């Protein structure tokens, strides 16, 4: 599906991370909310600054489920460290591999934790020679791969079962972005999908509630529907997947091969 998105770790600035104090501030802010699961993008570089005991000790103070996204090279290190600590956490892992991974084949994880494994595809060769769940990654020069394997076709729309709840939702909000907040390694806070920072974790009196209120007022991405784009005249605009981060980052707000002028 063209709009599917995953919080995959980035090779760029891979050593950058929130401090343990910043992480504590963020999780403290979530205690009185309805948030149940926190996604954490992790690199072993974090363990060069803090011990695994410090990280696990902090996370265990809260009653959240944690979904950790990391590369396969980092997975065994963190799980081995966690298993040495006599503290139970509600943890699951999304483990990513790509052509640069030292483990070049999919393997079975022997762990007490739930693990999903995904392979990152940068070009058509990555897609053709790998099995399992494959995630296309936009590099800026692989438009042909996205056009062939990711873009929505008219047949995709015609085969879609119309769901009135989804149809109404797509008219009012963007389900890819709505309710999601991103916190970057430098502490800047964004509405998911937005390039505009709303606040920083280090700001005096920082509050995630204020961040949510600000997004509701400014409407950066949470209500970015196809009606707000050049798709606004397309009769399928509320059946298509909502606007995705790929479309925003690539400045291509139309991930399909549908020419509605010819319909």
Q: For the regions a protein language model found, what residue spans apply to each?
A:
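C-terminal accessory region of radical SAM enzymes
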Residues: 142-163, 194-241
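Conserved C-terminal portion of the radical SAM core fold
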Residues: 62, 66-67, 83-163
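Conserved, mostly hydrophobic/aromatic
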Residues: 187
């Amino acid at each position: 599906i063209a709009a599917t998105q995953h919080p995959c770790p980035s090779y760029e600035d891979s050593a950058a991370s929130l401090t343990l104090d910043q992480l504590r501030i963020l999780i403290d802010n979530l205690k009185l909310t309805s948030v149940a699961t926190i996604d954490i993008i992790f690199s072993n570089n974090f363990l060069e600054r803090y011990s695994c005991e410090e990280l696990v000790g902090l996370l265990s103070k809260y009653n959240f489920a944690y979904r950790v996204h990391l590369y396969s090279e980092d997975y065994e290190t963190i799980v081995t460290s966690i298993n040495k600590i006599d503290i139970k956490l509600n943890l699951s892992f999304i483990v990513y591999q790509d052509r640069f991974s030292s483990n070049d084949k999919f393997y079975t994880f022997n762990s007490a934790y739930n693990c999903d494994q995904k392979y990152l595809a940068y070009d058509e060769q990555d897609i053709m020679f790998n099995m399992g769940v494959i995630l296309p990654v936009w590099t800026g020069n692989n438009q042909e791969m996205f056009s062939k394997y990711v873009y929505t076709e008219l047949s995709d729309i015609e085969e879609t079962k119309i769901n009135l709840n989804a149809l109404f939702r797509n008219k009012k909000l963007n389900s890819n972005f709505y309710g999601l907040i991103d916190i970057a390694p430098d502490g800047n806070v964004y509405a998911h999908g937005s390039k505009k920072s709303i606040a920083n974790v280090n700001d005096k009196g920082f509050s995630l509630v204020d961040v949510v209120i600000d997004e509701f007022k400014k409407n950066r991405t949470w209500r970015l529907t196809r009606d707000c784009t050049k798709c606004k005249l397309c009769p399928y605009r509320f059946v298509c997947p909502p606007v995705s981060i790929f479309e925003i980052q690539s400045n291509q707000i139309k991930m399909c091969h549908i020419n509605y002028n010819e319909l």
